[in-house]
């Protein structure tokens, strides 16, 4: 897509929001409480602040203010208000390709924010526990927050990821013509590295005419030991391993497809 010569500031708002899920099986009530405490500590407000601050560095944003809070009995929230950095928009790469991990990318932001909220969850029946983190990166300016997607998914290793990207508002060129998007995009997947895409099953649901792009991701490899908390697979009978595997698989399928499915 050719570069637009704009009249004034780029007023497009680009928002990336995604949910990441971590699934776990616990055998006892104590193990369930232990998992919730463990995951709550792993993703406390301080660690989330570090991740989001690095995200700001990747997209080149200035941190104006940080609000963070851990909750009782569990959960955490972090919101960072960021501002623009004065750069020449002609120097910004808007092509579709994966963003960097620790390297810096310039951005042009105004009244933008990055926020995350966590939701540990469990139920006394079945032994399943889930951890969900909701993340939103919203920017006004010349680049897409999708540049931070690669880094964030690498940092928050997950079993299931649902991603929504949308562009809202419009900007005008020097002739007064409105432009409702200023970069090419066919799929959110184009902003992910090949190694990441190889790890997940992916499905797109895009509404191109509305500038809405949706991608779902489900981890391909299933190793039971990675889903057990304080339980060794070798200590379980073959029948018990199959029962737990079926339980976990069914839970992940329901979350991935976003609906209740019949138990086979």
From Swiss-Prot:
Instruction: Kindly state a single biological-process term from the GO annotations of this entry.
Output: spermidine biosynthetic process
Q: What does the record say about how the cofactor binds? A: Binds 1 pyruvoyl group covalently per subunit.
Say yes or no: keyword Cell division present.
Answer: no
* Cofactor(s) the protein requires to work: pyruvate
Q: Does the keyword S-adenosyl-L-methionine apply?
A: yes
Q: Which GO terms describe its cellular component?
A: cytosol
State the oligomer form and interacting partners: Heterooctamer of four alpha and four beta chains arranged as a tetramer of alpha/beta heterodimers.
Query: Which protein are we looking at?
Result: S-adenosylmethionine decarboxylase proenzyme
Which species is the source of this protein? Pectobacterium atrosepticum (strain SCRI 1043 / ATCC BAA-672) (Erwinia carotovora subsp. atroseptica)
Q: Which gene encodes it?
A: speD
